Amino acid sequence: MGHYKANVRDLEFNLFEVFGRQEILGKGIYADLDVEAAKDILGEVARLAENELAASLVDSDRNPPIYDPVTCSVTIPESFKKSYQAYLDGEWGRLDTPVELGGMAVPPSLRWSIAEMVCGANPAIHMYGATFSFAKLLWHMGTEDQKKLAKHIVDNAWHTTTVSYTHLTLPTSDLV
């Protein structure tokens, strides 16, 4: 076990005993998500955060991305690639993706509970996972061309990022 231990009981207490999320789950826009499914999501993200995501924290912290100006490429630790791929394989970013783009209607309070675990385990994974949040922003506020880009971002888990150099941009998919 790594450095991170998710406090699922605290998250469930806040979601269901303080904020009463059981009153909205299984109904209306959240009809496809009941309390049991929400708790299952919390449990699975906790397992992922404590294991696969936390596993690369120290290595990726001690070995930051390195830009090679000759090849215009960025190198990141293999352990980080493996952690991020585990996040992508679980399709956890789709919980913050519009339904129209293949996402799932999830209350913001549940999304923030998930974000707490991912960020606690490995903040860089949380930032890379923001790819899907950026797509959501483009989908809701963008032009028609930007909405096409949002779909591309979600379909390919891709976006352009700047890594320490204001003139450098490349697809995140090239890093993984």
Tell me the role of every PLM-derived stretch.
Residues 1-125:
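Amphipathic, small/basic residue-rich leader segments at the start of a protein or domain
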Residues 97-100, 130, 165:
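An acidic- and aromatic-residue-enriched active-site/binding cleft used to recognize and process polar
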Residues 126-144:
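N-terminal glycine-rich flavin-associated loop
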Residues 131-135, 155, 168:
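A glycine-rich phosphate-binding loop feature that marks nucleotide/adenosyl-phosphate handling sites
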Residues 152:
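Conserved catalytic alpha/beta cores of large enzymes that bind or transform nucleotide phosphates
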Residues 156-164:
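A short, Trp-centered hydrophobic/proline-enriched beta-strand micro-motif
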Residues 166-172:
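Conserved small/polar residues in nucleotide/adenosyl-binding loops
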Residues 174-176:
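Acidic, Ala/Val/Gly-enriched low-complexity intrinsically disordered segments
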